[in-house]
Curated annotation (Swiss-Prot):
Biological pathway: Amino-acid biosynthesis; L-histidine biosynthesis; L-histidine from 5-phospho-alpha-D-ribose 1-diphosphate: step 1/9
Keywords annotated in UniProt: Amino-acid biosynthesis, ATP-binding, Cytoplasm, Glycosyltransferase, Histidine biosynthesis, Nucleotide-binding, Transferase
Reaction(s) catalysed (UniProt annotation): 1-(5-phospho-beta-D-ribosyl)-ATP + diphosphate = 5-phospho-alpha-D-ribose 1-diphosphate + ATP
UniProt keyword Cytoplasm present: yes
Free-text note on domains in this protein's UniProt record: Lacks the C-terminal regulatory region which is replaced by HisZ.
EC class (word): transferase
GO CC, alphabetical: cytoplasm
Entry protein name: ATP phosphoribosyltransferase
Chief location bin: cytoplasm
Cellular compartment(s): Cytoplasm
Function: Catalyzes the condensation of ATP and 5-phosphoribose 1-diphosphate to form N'-(5'-phosphoribosyl)-ATP (PR-ATP). Has a crucial role in the pathway because the rate of histidine biosynthesis seems to be controlled primarily by regulation of HisG enzymatic activity.
Assembly information from the UniProt record: Heteromultimer composed of HisG and HisZ subunits.
HAMAP family xrefs: HisG_Short (MF_01018)
Source organism of the structure: Staphylococcus aureus (strain bovine RF122 / ET3-1)
Protein backbone atom coordinates (compact mmCIF):
# COMPACT_ATOMS: atom_id res chain seq x y z
CA UNK A 1 0.00 0.00 0.00
CA UNK A 2 1.27 3.44 -0.97
CA UNK A 3 -0.02 6.32 1.13
CA UNK A 4 -0.24 9.72 -0.57
CA UNK A 5 -0.84 13.07 1.15
CA UNK A 6 -2.77 15.42 -1.12
CA UNK A 7 -3.38 19.13 -0.60
CA UNK A 8 -7.09 19.93 -0.41
CA UNK A 9 -8.69 22.77 -2.36
CA UNK A 10 -7.45 24.34 -5.59
CA UNK A 11 -4.52 21.96 -6.03
CA UNK A 12 -6.65 18.85 -5.61
CA UNK A 13 -9.11 20.18 -8.18
CA UNK A 14 -6.20 20.60 -10.60
CA UNK A 15 -5.00 17.09 -9.78
CA UNK A 16 -8.43 15.61 -10.51
CA UNK A 17 -8.57 17.40 -13.88
CA UNK A 18 -5.09 16.12 -14.69
CA UNK A 19 -5.96 12.54 -13.71
CA UNK A 20 -9.05 12.73 -15.92
CA UNK A 21 -6.93 13.99 -18.82
CA UNK A 22 -4.51 11.06 -18.54
CA UNK A 23 -7.35 8.60 -17.88
CA UNK A 24 -6.22 7.65 -14.38
CA UNK A 25 -9.93 7.27 -13.67
CA UNK A 26 -9.81 4.98 -10.63
CA UNK A 27 -7.99 7.62 -8.61
CA UNK A 28 -9.83 10.62 -10.04
CA UNK A 29 -13.26 9.09 -9.39
CA UNK A 30 -12.27 8.19 -5.84
CA UNK A 31 -11.25 11.79 -5.18
CA UNK A 32 -14.40 13.17 -6.83
CA UNK A 33 -16.69 10.97 -4.71
CA UNK A 34 -14.94 11.62 -1.41
CA UNK A 35 -17.79 13.59 0.24
CA UNK A 36 -16.28 14.61 3.62
CA UNK A 37 -13.85 11.73 3.95
CA UNK A 38 -10.22 12.56 4.64
CA UNK A 39 -8.86 9.02 4.19
CA UNK A 40 -9.58 7.22 0.92
CA UNK A 41 -8.43 3.91 -0.58
CA UNK A 42 -8.33 2.67 -4.16
CA UNK A 43 -6.39 -0.36 -5.42
CA UNK A 44 -2.98 -0.21 -3.68
CA UNK A 45 -3.18 3.54 -3.00
CA UNK A 46 -4.36 5.25 0.18
CA UNK A 47 -4.95 9.00 0.05
CA UNK A 48 -4.97 11.34 3.01
CA UNK A 49 -6.45 14.76 2.30
CA UNK A 50 -4.90 17.58 4.33
CA UNK A 51 -4.28 21.31 4.28
CA UNK A 52 -1.58 22.22 1.77
CA UNK A 53 0.89 23.45 4.38
CA UNK A 54 0.55 20.14 6.25
CA UNK A 55 1.39 17.87 3.29
CA UNK A 56 5.20 18.03 3.70
CA UNK A 57 4.83 17.54 7.46
CA UNK A 58 2.87 14.30 7.00
CA UNK A 59 5.50 13.15 4.49
CA UNK A 60 8.44 14.25 6.63
CA UNK A 61 7.02 12.42 9.67
CA UNK A 62 6.51 9.22 7.67
CA UNK A 63 2.72 9.17 7.94
CA UNK A 64 2.55 9.54 4.16
CA UNK A 65 5.03 7.93 1.78
CA UNK A 66 4.64 10.60 -0.88
CA UNK A 67 2.85 13.92 -1.20
CA UNK A 68 1.49 16.23 -3.87
CA UNK A 69 1.88 19.85 -2.84
CA UNK A 70 2.40 23.30 -4.31
CA UNK A 71 5.95 24.57 -4.66
CA UNK A 72 4.83 27.68 -2.75
CA UNK A 73 4.68 25.58 0.43
CA UNK A 74 8.11 24.05 -0.15
CA UNK A 75 9.65 27.46 -0.87
CA UNK A 76 8.51 28.89 2.47
CA UNK A 77 10.63 26.59 4.66
CA UNK A 78 12.96 23.60 4.48
CA UNK A 79 11.48 20.13 4.87
CA UNK A 80 13.50 16.93 5.17
CA UNK A 81 11.90 15.25 2.15
CA UNK A 82 12.90 14.23 -1.37
CA UNK A 83 11.63 16.61 -4.03
CA UNK A 84 11.15 14.14 -6.87
CA UNK A 85 9.00 15.45 -9.66
CA UNK A 86 7.52 18.64 -11.06
CA UNK A 87 3.91 17.97 -11.99
CA UNK A 88 2.32 19.45 -15.13
CA UNK A 89 -0.61 21.06 -13.32
CA UNK A 90 -1.33 23.56 -10.55
CA UNK A 91 0.41 26.40 -12.37
CA UNK A 92 0.10 29.87 -10.83
CA UNK A 93 2.53 32.47 -9.52
CA UNK A 94 3.51 34.72 -6.65
CA UNK A 95 2.85 38.41 -7.25
CA UNK A 96 2.83 41.79 -5.59
CA UNK A 97 -0.64 43.33 -5.85
CA UNK A 98 -2.04 46.67 -4.76
CA UNK A 99 -4.53 49.37 -5.66
CA UNK A 100 -3.92 50.77 -9.17
CA UNK A 101 -2.59 54.10 -7.90
CA UNK A 102 -0.08 52.61 -5.43
CA UNK A 103 3.59 53.09 -6.30
CA UNK A 104 5.39 52.88 -2.94
CA UNK A 105 5.34 50.05 -0.44
CA UNK A 106 5.93 50.45 3.29
CA UNK A 107 3.63 47.74 4.65
CA UNK A 108 2.90 44.43 2.95
CA UNK A 109 0.43 41.76 4.05
CA UNK A 110 1.11 38.14 3.12
CA UNK A 111 0.78 34.53 4.19
CA UNK A 112 4.20 33.89 2.61
CA UNK A 113 6.64 35.86 4.70
CA UNK A 114 9.82 34.15 3.48
CA UNK A 115 8.94 34.66 -0.18
CA UNK A 116 7.92 38.29 0.36
CA UNK A 117 10.99 39.08 2.45
CA UNK A 118 13.35 37.56 -0.12
CA UNK A 119 11.71 39.44 -2.98
CA UNK A 120 11.76 42.91 -1.43
CA UNK A 121 15.28 42.35 -0.11
CA UNK A 122 16.43 41.50 -3.64
CA UNK A 123 14.94 44.81 -4.81
CA UNK A 124 16.55 46.78 -1.99
CA UNK A 125 13.15 47.83 -0.65
CA UNK A 126 12.68 47.98 3.12
CA UNK A 127 9.13 46.97 4.03
CA UNK A 128 7.22 45.95 7.13
CA UNK A 129 5.67 42.52 6.62
CA UNK A 130 2.39 41.64 8.31
CA UNK A 131 1.61 37.93 8.34
CA UNK A 132 -2.03 37.01 7.75
CA UNK A 133 -3.49 33.53 7.38
CA UNK A 134 -6.08 34.28 4.72
CA UNK A 135 -7.98 36.94 2.74
CA UNK A 136 -4.90 39.14 2.48
CA UNK A 137 -6.68 41.23 -0.17
CA UNK A 138 -8.87 42.73 2.56
CA UNK A 139 -5.86 44.23 4.32
CA UNK A 140 -5.13 46.23 1.18
CA UNK A 141 -8.75 47.16 0.52
CA UNK A 142 -9.13 48.73 3.99
CA UNK A 143 -5.71 50.43 3.73
CA UNK A 144 -4.05 48.49 6.53
CA UNK A 145 -1.19 47.88 4.10
CA UNK A 146 0.09 49.33 0.84
CA UNK A 147 0.16 46.01 -0.97
CA UNK A 148 0.11 42.25 -0.68
CA UNK A 149 2.18 39.28 -1.77
CA UNK A 150 -0.05 36.38 -2.69
CA UNK A 151 -0.67 33.56 -5.13
CA UNK A 152 -2.35 34.60 -8.37
CA UNK A 153 -3.96 32.13 -10.74
CA UNK A 154 -6.54 33.99 -12.81
CA UNK A 155 -6.52 37.42 -11.16
CA UNK A 156 -10.28 37.26 -10.62
CA UNK A 157 -10.06 37.74 -6.84
CA UNK A 158 -7.77 40.74 -7.24
CA UNK A 159 -10.09 42.35 -9.77
CA UNK A 160 -13.15 41.72 -7.59
CA UNK A 161 -11.47 43.65 -4.78
CA UNK A 162 -10.22 46.55 -6.87
CA UNK A 163 -6.59 45.41 -6.87
CA UNK A 164 -4.15 44.86 -9.73
CA UNK A 165 -1.02 42.80 -10.13
CA UNK A 166 2.04 45.04 -9.88
CA UNK A 167 4.97 42.63 -10.09
CA UNK A 168 5.37 38.97 -10.99
CA UNK A 169 7.65 37.34 -8.40
CA UNK A 170 8.02 33.66 -9.31
CA UNK A 171 6.17 30.73 -10.84
CA UNK A 172 4.49 27.98 -8.82
CA UNK A 173 3.55 24.44 -9.77
CA UNK A 174 2.61 21.17 -8.12
CA UNK A 175 5.42 18.89 -6.95
CA UNK A 176 5.65 15.28 -5.93
CA UNK A 177 7.68 14.72 -2.76
CA UNK A 178 8.61 11.56 -0.85
CA UNK A 179 9.58 10.55 2.64
CA UNK A 180 13.30 9.74 2.61
CA UNK A 181 12.96 6.36 4.32
CA UNK A 182 9.91 5.37 2.27
CA UNK A 183 11.79 6.15 -0.92
CA UNK A 184 13.97 3.11 -0.21
CA UNK A 185 11.50 0.89 1.65
CA UNK A 186 8.73 1.39 -0.90
CA UNK A 187 10.83 2.26 -3.92
CA UNK A 188 9.04 -0.19 -6.19
CA UNK A 189 5.59 1.20 -5.37
CA UNK A 190 6.78 4.80 -5.64
CA UNK A 191 8.57 4.22 -8.93
CA UNK A 192 5.53 2.37 -10.29
CA UNK A 193 3.30 5.32 -9.40
CA UNK A 194 5.70 7.83 -10.95
CA UNK A 195 6.20 5.66 -14.01
CA UNK A 196 2.46 5.45 -14.58
CA UNK A 197 2.27 9.25 -14.51
CA UNK A 198 5.20 9.59 -16.91
CA UNK A 199 3.71 7.07 -19.34
CA UNK A 200 0.40 8.91 -19.18
CA UNK A 201 2.13 12.23 -19.77
CA UNK A 202 3.96 10.80 -22.78
CA UNK A 203 0.70 9.48 -24.21
CA UNK A 204 -1.30 12.65 -23.57
Amino acid sequence: MLRIAIAKGRLMDSLINYLDAIEFTTLSETLKNRERQLLLSVDNIECILVKGSDVPIYVEQGIADIGIVGSDILDERHYNVNNLLDMPFGACHFAVAAKPETTNYRKIATSYVHTAEAYFKSKGIDVELIKLNGSVELACVVDMVDGIVDIVQTGTTLEANGLVEKQHISDINARLITNKAAYFKKSQLIEQFIRSLEVSIANA
